[in-house]
Amino acid sequence: MIAPTEPTEGNSRASVLEFDEEGYVESEDEDFDPSKPADDDKEEELSDKSDGDYQEADEEAEKYDYSHIESSEGGLVSTRNARRLQHEREQREKYEHFEMQGVSSRAGELWAQLQEESQARLHDTSSVMHAGGEAGKDRMQEEQIMIERAYWFAGEMVREKKMVLKSSAEAQEYLNSLKFKPKELVPSTMQEMDGGSKLRRPLKRPPILEQIIAGALKPKLTTLEKSKLDWATYVDKEGINEELQLFNKDGYLAKQDFLRKVDGIQNEQYKELRRQELQKNGAQGM
């Protein structure tokens, strides 16, 4: 606590304050500031400076030297940026010092062998293509006929004409569907006058019956006939005509007949062996 004293004669203007050091608490003082250093610290700091023990200037002047510190792999310790720059420089210099080496004789022989095999394959491919082209040309040179189909579709008469091979299933179906063979119309004869001049007889429209007999009018296709033609077109497109002929109904019946004959022959052979076995056993018993 601060104990005020009575003013003396020598100091009448100012009052002297005496501090009770034992009972004084600094935190209870109104002017206490915890952020400021204490007076005792200031006094110690001043005493250190005065005695020469304070070496702050020397510590600030001292600088750490990392140039002699080495990593476990050897060399100076580098930062991330230095390592990145070093890596980029190594990548750039990687191809600058690359030297082309001569190709060995073994590699040259393998390359020549591969070239020969490639040329041989190209030659074989060209030969196959040439043979296929000749076969297709021969097929095109085969006799072709024009077939015409007329049928109602969606309420409209549709007429279709196309060239097909005479040996194709579609052509055979079309020829079988024709009820009348086409006949050439006889051209109108010309008459000569006594004077030697030729006159043309005016043409008239022939009757429909004569056109049908002559084959000028094609019969309309029924739904069944159109289905047959569509099936024949599909067979020619897929190329299964020979396969169908091999596995048709007649072929199946022929196979069944052959199997029955084989079974009959096997039964006859079994009966003959059985009869011989019985005769042999009877002779031994007698």
From Swiss-Prot:
Q: Where is this region: Disordered?
A: 1-90
Q: Where is the composition biased (Acidic residues)?
A: 18-32, 53-62
Q: Name one GO cellular component term.
A: Swr1 complex
Chief location: nucleus
- Keyword list, A-Z: Activator, Chromatin regulator, Nucleus, Transcription, Transcription regulation
Enumerate the CDD domains for this protein: Swc5_NTD
The places in or outside the cell where this protein is found are: Nucleus
List the Pfam families hit by this protein, alphabetically.
BCNT
One GO biological process this protein is involved in is:
chromatin remodeling
Protein biosynthesis is among the record's keywords: no
Q: Which residues form the BCNT-C domain?
A: 203-280
Question: So what does this one do?
Answer: Component of the SWR1 complex which mediates the ATP-dependent exchange of histone H2A for the H2A variant HZT1 leading to transcriptional regulation of selected genes by chromatin remodeling. Involved in chromosome stability.
Family statement: Belongs to the SWC5 family.
Q: How does it assemble?
A: Component of the SWR1 chromatin remodeling complex.
Q: What is this protein called?
A: SWR1-complex protein 5
Upper lineage: Eukaryota, Fungi, Dikarya, Ascomycota, Saccharomycotina
